[in-house]
Each structure stands twice: as C-alpha cells, then as structure tokens.
Amino acid sequence: MHDDVVYCKYYEVVYILFHTGMRISEFCGLTLKDIDLENRTVNIDHQLQRTSDMRYIIETTKTDAGTRVLPITEDVAQMFQVIIEDRNAPKVEKSIDGYSGFLFYDDNGMPLVAMHWQHRFNHMVGRYNDIYWMQMPNITPLMYADTPIAQIWQNRE
C-alpha cells in the first residue's frame, strides 16, 4: 500500500489505526487541537458520526473508558505530522457541534466519516486482490480497534 500510486495517500491513516486501535469514528472526530505532537499524545473524548438523515454530529466516546489521552510513539506522531502537513482543508471550515479543524474533508467541505473510510478500505482490498494471487479478505476500519498492537496499548494503562 505504501508504494501504490493510488492508495499511498491513505498509508498514514491505516498505520495510525493499526498502531493505536483507535475507533474509526474517533479518528474521524479528531481535530488539530486534539493532537499534541510535542508531547506525543492524542486527546480522544469525542467521535464524529453521521446520522441516517445525513446530519453530522459529535458524540461522546462509546464508553467512559474510551475517553482517554492516548500516548503515541514517534512513528505514529510522524504519521500525524504528514497528515497535518498535507491537510487539504476547505477555505471555510465547517463547525460540527463546536468542533472544527478536522483532519480530512470531502469534496463538499464536510469532514470525512466512517462510511468514507469503509469505501476506501473496500477499494484498497479490491485493488490488492486484482493484482496479487494471494487474496486479502475484506477488512474494515473497525478491525483495527481489535489488533494485537492496539491490545498492547490498552493493557499499558
């Protein structure tokens, strides 16, 4: 994926999700204020959701334990740095329930939500399976929350 001409632009996101175990809706809700590269922490106290009637809302984390200040490694901090440097924000950033400065936006200037990333993951797997004989199973952003690396992070607390 890192060297793929199409999907290399999502490498940092996949890396962050895999190495932190962050839920995709938590990642989508991250704003520039939540990321402290100097102290290598990420504040996770909310998530971005899009309702069935297409409204964007901020909700608290899924559980009380989900509210946390997540320490990040140097390599994860570097991935966030790349995302921040390459961030393509609209001229006027939308505020969702008082939050603005999201990391990724769609063509309409709205923050990306879990569904956007699910589509990207489906396309990444499809491209891989078109190229390689050994097929990759369908993956979802939610799967990253249960990775062994994520479990190690969670057990550190």
What are these regions (language model features)?
Residues 51-52, 111-112, 148:
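Flexible loop/turn segments at secondary-structure boundaries
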Residues 18, 31, 39, 46, ...:
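Active-site proximal loops enriched in glycine and acidic residues that flank catalytic Cys/His/Asp
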Residues 12-15, 19-26, 115-116, 120-123, ...:
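C-terminal catalytic core of tyrosine-transesterase DNA break-rejoin enzymes
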Residues 34:
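Phosphate-binding active sites in nucleotide-utilizing proteins
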Residues 2-5, 57-67, 105-114, 129-143, ...:
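Short, contiguous acidic/charged loop-to-helix segments that flank catalytic cores in large enzymes
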Residues 73-132, 151:
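Active-site/catalytic core of tyrosine-dependent DNA strand-transfer enzymes
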Residues 1-24, 28-30, 38, 67, ...:
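Basic, Lys/Arg- and aromatic-enriched nucleic-acid-binding interface segment
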Residues 2-4, 25, 38-71, 75, ...:
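Basic, Lys/Arg-rich DNA-contacting stretches centered on the C-terminal catalytic core
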